[in-house]
């Protein structure tokens, strides 16, 4: 785990403009600042970039936490920043979602969820490394919010031409980086596990996790 933290820090810290991949649903990265980030009323407080392009959205949900106990560790309560899916399509959002991955060394990674779905995260030619985080035990379960599917096949006559549609606001790697407003986040969007608003004057940690799992029928492949 320490080696992965070091690699991520080297890629992202001090405005390096590097890139990391979060993998499939639930994969996450946590950021810690050298100062608290104030919740400025009436303004966005965070700007988080990804590598989204038109029809290539891979939205990640943002969570925030305040270092209440002052120990410098992300072990205080976490709160999700509510995004547009909670307004535009709440009936299609799966809250309290759970997915479990099983280690199969250097092979496709099988998974099951609490919605009676199953599939595999397929290996591809672009990423040769082990897909399962070997510093964690198998089985590995992630819990969170599952956003509505954003993949649309625009191919004709049986052709495959998948587009990943963007949500209106509130997610990382959802809109191109030149959309400053679309990649900015308000700490005032924070909600608790019951989706009730939470008042935070400042935060010390930010977490981004991948919030989709697409299943390609009939192969049950995931991406």
What is each residue range found by the language model?
Residues 201-203:
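Extracellular Ig-like/FN3 beta-sandwich strand-entry sites
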Residues 208-212:
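Short beta-strand-plus-loop segments that form exposed binding edges in beta-rich domains
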Residues 84-179:
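Low-complexity, serine/threonine/proline-enriched polar segments
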Residues 180-196:
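A Trp-anchored, charged/polar loop motif used as the substrate-binding/catalytic surface
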Residues 68-77, 93-95, 101:
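Acidic, glycine-anchored loop motifs typical of Ca2+
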Residues 213-219:
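Residue-level detector of conserved catalytic or cofactor/ligand-binding positions
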Residues 57-64, 72-86:
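Extracytoplasmic, non-cytosolic globular domains
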């Amino acid at each position: 785990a320490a080696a992965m933290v070091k690699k991520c820090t080297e890629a992202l810290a001090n405005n390096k403009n590097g890139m990391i991949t979060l993998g499939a649903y639930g994969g996450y990265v946590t950021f810690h600042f050298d100062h608290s980030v104030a919740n400025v009323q009436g303004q966005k407080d965070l700007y988080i970039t990804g590598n989204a392009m038109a029809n290539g959205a891979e939205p990640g949900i943002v969570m925030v936490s305040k270092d209440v106990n002052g120990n410098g560790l992300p072990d205080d309560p976490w709160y999700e920043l509510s995004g547009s899916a909670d307004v535009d399509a709440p009936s299609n959002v799966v809250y309290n979602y759970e997915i479990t991955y099983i280690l199969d060394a250097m092979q496709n990674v099988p998974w099951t969820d609490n919605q009676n779905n199953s599939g595999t995260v397929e290996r591809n030619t672009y990423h040769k490394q082990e897909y399962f985080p070997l510093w964690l035990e198998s089985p590995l379960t992630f819990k969170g919010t599952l956003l509505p599917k954003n993949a649309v096949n625009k191919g004709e006559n049986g052709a495959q031409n998948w587009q990943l549609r963007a949500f209106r606001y509130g997610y990382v790697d959802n809109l191109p980086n030149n959309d400053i407003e679309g990649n900015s986040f308000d700490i005032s969007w924070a909600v608790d596990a019951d989706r009730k608003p939470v008042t935070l004057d400042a935060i010390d940690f930010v977490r981004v996790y991948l919030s989709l799992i697409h299943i390609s029928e009939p192969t049950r492949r995931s991406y």
